């Protein structure tokens, strides 16, 4: 690569880092003053962070902090209130986690249980219990998290027995922008029975990978709505639901985010729309 190209790439990287730092500073400043808004909040994370032992303490501290401003509730209760379009006069928070990483079992679930709540865990059956080659490819090419491990099938079954909701997240964390019927049937419909076989429980919930409407075709969304009782996005969070109330919207977060950032996003009100 020429010196000019290297210089240009470095300049773009520096600008990106500057924008990121400025955004973080704004969120921190606003979040320090924010309080969790009244309403039902569903947070959507993925894993416990890069340093799992430390981040279990970070997650515990976050839950303690949020519990001072809101009622932490089981995910079924939160979803039911949204489905019934019930306005609430207090802040309520529930949790979901996608992909099926092993730290959901070893760190996340026990910490949630300390606070008397569960979560919905949306798993990729192709990843759970996969061989080393599949895991390495998934970590590198799909989620960009080298070194992560998936839960085993026994771990998923155990969590289901402990009251965690096990949902579907496609077989292979597929981008569902396709309209190919065979691909969509495999990733959406076949995923339901695959999750049920692993968990030993009925799978009625689905969250599509990447979570935004630009990552799912209208054909794929209709198939998901026909296959599952509840479908979740990670888009359009100010609205409780989308697509005529058939899709419930979650707010992305991660365990290792600063508390002020999480509080900032939870300080935004929600509505059922017109």
Where are these regions (language model features)?
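Glycine-enriched alpha-helix->loop->beta-strand junction motifs that scaffold or abut catalytic
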Residues: 113-118, 162-166, 225-230
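A short, Lys/Arg-enriched amphipathic alpha-helix followed by its capping loop at the start of a domain
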Residues: 61-69, 111-115, 162
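A short alpha/beta connector and helix-capping loop motif
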Residues: 107-125
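C-terminal active-site subregion of NodB/CE4 polysaccharide deacetylases
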Residues: 1-96, 102-103, 178-274
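Aromatic- and acidic-residue-enriched segments that line the glycan-binding/catalytic groove
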Residues: 129-147
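Active-site glycine- and acidic-residue-rich loops that bind
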Residues: 99, 144-150, 214-215
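Generic enzyme active-site microenvironment
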Residues: 96-97, 167
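Histidine/lysine/aspartate-rich catalytic loop segments that bind and position anionic ligands
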Residues: 151-156, 160-183
């Amino acid at each position: 690569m020429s010196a000019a190209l290297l210089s240009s790439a470095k300049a773009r990287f520096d600008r990106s880092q500057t924008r990121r730092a400025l955004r973080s500073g704004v969120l921190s400043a606003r979040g320090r003053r924010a309080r969790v808004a009244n309403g039902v909040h569903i947070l959507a994370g993925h894993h416990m962070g890069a340093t799992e032992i430390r981040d279990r303490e970070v997650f515990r501290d976050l839950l303690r902090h949020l519990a001072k401003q809101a009622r932490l509730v089981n995910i079924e209760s939160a979803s039911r209130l949204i489905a019934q379009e019930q306005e609430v006069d207090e802040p309520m928070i529930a949790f979901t986690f996608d992909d099926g990483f092993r730290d959901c079992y070893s760190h996340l679930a026990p910490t949630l249980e300390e606070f008397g709540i569960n979560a919905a865990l949306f798993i990729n059956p192709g990843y759970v219990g996969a061989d080393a080659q599949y895991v390495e490819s998934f970590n590198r090419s799909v989620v960009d998290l080298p070194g992560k491990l998936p839960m085993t099938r026994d771990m998923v079954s155990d969590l289901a027995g402990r009251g965690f909701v096990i949902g579907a997240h496609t077989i292979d964390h597929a981008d569902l922008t396709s309209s190919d019927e065979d691909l969509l049937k495999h990733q959406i419909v076949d995923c339901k029975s695959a999750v049920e076989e692993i968990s030993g429980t009925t799978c009625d919930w689905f969250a599509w990978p990447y979570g935004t409407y630009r990552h799912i075709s209208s054909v794929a969304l209709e198939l998901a709505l026909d296959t599952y009782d509840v479908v979740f996005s990670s888009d359009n969070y100010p609205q409780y639901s989308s697509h005529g109330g058939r899709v419930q919207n979650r707010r992305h977060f991660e365990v290792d985010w600063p508390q002020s950032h999480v509080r900032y996003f939870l300080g935004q009100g929600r509505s059922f729309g017109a």
